[in-house]
């Protein structure tokens, strides 16, 4: 219904709307219904939105929760879409996507975490990595992670 009206909005708002729509219901029942590559690209689109629209701080606040979820899903998987099926070997599709993401988006705030995840020998206890990402998300000055006025 809204699709026909979106094109009447300013470009920055059209891009915002498309990010929200493309992030909607990507993981029903804790399982991804998009590929790892699509997830990586969606995460990168959020990050590109910040660079393209640096003055849209209010919209960043509205994207914040989805962005955090995308980071967690990309790095740790979901209950029904794990990154490793035996806690030792990384899923090959995940590995390929992390490697592609690192190469394609070297300046992404997610890239250092993907690099570190690739160094893991086992995937049965990633609490230290999870905590590290959580701390980064809570303390970062990155526009999609900064404290928002209503969220303080």
Task: Provide a role label for each language-model segment.
Residues 1-152:
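Acidic, polar-rich low-complexity tracts and alpha-helical solenoid repeat scaffolds
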């Amino acid at each position: 219904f809204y699709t026909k009206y979106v094109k009447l909005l300013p470009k920055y708002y059209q891009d915002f709307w498309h990010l929200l729509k493309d992030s909607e219901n990507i993981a029903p029942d804790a399982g991804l219904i998009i590929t790892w590559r699509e997830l990586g690209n969606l995460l990168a689109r959020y990050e590109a939105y910040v660079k393209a629209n640096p003055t849209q701080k209010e919209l960043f606040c509205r994207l914040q929760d989805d962005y955090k979820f995308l980071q967690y899903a990309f790095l740790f998987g979901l209950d029904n879409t794990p990154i490793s099926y035996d806690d030792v070997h990384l899923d090959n599709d995940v590995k390929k996507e992390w490697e592609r993401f690192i190469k394609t988006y070297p300046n992404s705030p997610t890239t250092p975490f993907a690099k570190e995840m690739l160094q893991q020998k086992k995937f049965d206890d990633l609490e230290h990595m999870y905590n590290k990402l959580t701390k980064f998300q809570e303390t970062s000055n990155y526009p999609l992670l900064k404290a928002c006025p209503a969220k303080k």
